[in-house]
Amino acid sequence: MRVLIDTNVLADVLLGRDPYYDIAYSILTMCADKKVYGYMAAHSIPNLFYILRKSMTKEERREVLKDICQIVKVEGIDSFKIISALDNVDFDDFEDCLQEECAVAVSADYIVTRNAKDFVSSRIPAILPEQFLEKYKDIMQT
């Protein structure tokens, strides 16, 4: 099972955001335990670096993002993905379209996001974190 984890789910863990933290943490644990192959889009890193600025120092942000990179693989963004996303008129949000491009590139089964409605045009189905855990809770047991 391969999943691309959207920036908002990663931020839930890094910021300890309630009520989302526990579910997001469980998904990252599945990735860390290699029960699920987790990926994130490369542009999630600078987005998170910026999002975390109010709660962490630069040094803390660097360390925590390096830690995340040990848990989930980073899928790069190249000119092909950018052009393809720019050509894709089915997405209102360019950043979401880049997430989808990265999910396609890694042959993800799902994009795990709290904004599944933003991915209705996606070639990869989007799933809410709680739906993913409910659907694949048996993976947690093994």
Language model features by range: what are they?
Residues M1-Y39, R53-E60, S121, K135-T142:
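Short, well-structured N-terminal submotif of metal-dependent ribonuclease cores
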Residues R2, V104-T142:
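Acidic, PIN/NYN-like endoribonuclease modules and their adjacent C-terminal/linker elements
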Residues V9, N47-L48, S84:
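A general alpha-helix detector
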Residues Y25, I45-K73, D78-F80:
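Active-site-proximal, substrate-binding regions of enzyme catalytic domains
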Residues K73-A116:
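Active-site neighborhoods of divalent-metal-dependent phosphate/nucleic-acid chemistry enzymes
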Residues M40-A41, T113:
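Short beta-strand segments at enzyme active-site cores
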